C-alpha cells in the first residue's frame, strides 16, 4: 500500500508547519499543500494531498488555488513539478491556469527487486 498514513502525514505537517496550508473538515485535516523551493522570484507548490475519502470535493483545487494566489500576490512565479501520466492532478492544475512548460527532468531508475 503506497498511501501515506494520516499519522505520518500529520507528523510531516507539524515538522514544517509554516510552509503548509491545510484544510480541515469536521476538525480533521483533509487536504494539504506545501510551498517549497522558494527563491526571490519563484516558489514551488508540492505535497498536494487529500485523504482518499474526501477526494472529489474540491479541496485540492481550493488549496492549490489559495497557495498560487498567495505566491503571486507576493510577486513570485508559482510553479509545479508534475507527472504527465497523472491525468487527475494535471486536470486540476490546468483548471487553475497552469500550463505545461518544457520538461526539466528525465528520470532513469533501476528496480531493487
Where are these regions (language model features)?
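Conserved beta-strand-loop-alpha-helix junction that forms the acyl-donor binding cleft
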Residues: 79-90, 106-113
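Conserved active-site alpha-helix within GNAT-family acetyltransferase domains
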Residues: 61, 85-102
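Residue-level detector of high-confidence beta-strand sites
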Residues: 32, 101-106
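A conserved beta-strand-loop-helix scaffold within acyl/acetyltransferase catalytic domains
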Residues: 2-49
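Conserved acyl-CoA
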Residues: 62-77, 99
Amino acid at each position: 500500500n503506497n498511501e501515506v498514513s494520516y499519522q505520518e502525514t500529520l507528523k510531516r505537517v507539524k515538522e514544517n508547519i509554516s510552509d503548509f496550508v491545510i484544510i480541515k473538515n469536521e476538525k480533521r485535516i483533509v487536504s494539504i499543500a506545501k510551498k517549497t523551493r522558494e527563491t526571490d522570484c519563484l516558489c514551488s507548490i508540492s505535497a498536494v494531498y487529500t485523504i482518499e475519502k474526501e477526494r472529489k470535493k474540491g479541496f485540492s483545487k481550493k488549496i492549490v488555488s489559495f497557495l498560487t494566489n498567495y505566491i503571486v500576490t507576493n510577486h513570485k512565479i508559482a510553479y509545479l513539478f508534475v507527472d504527465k501520466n497523472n491525468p487527475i492532478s494535471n486536470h486540476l492544475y490546468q483548471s487553475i491556469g497552469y500550463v505545461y512548460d518544457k520538461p526539466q527532468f528525465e528520470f532513469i531508475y533501476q528496480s531493487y527487486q
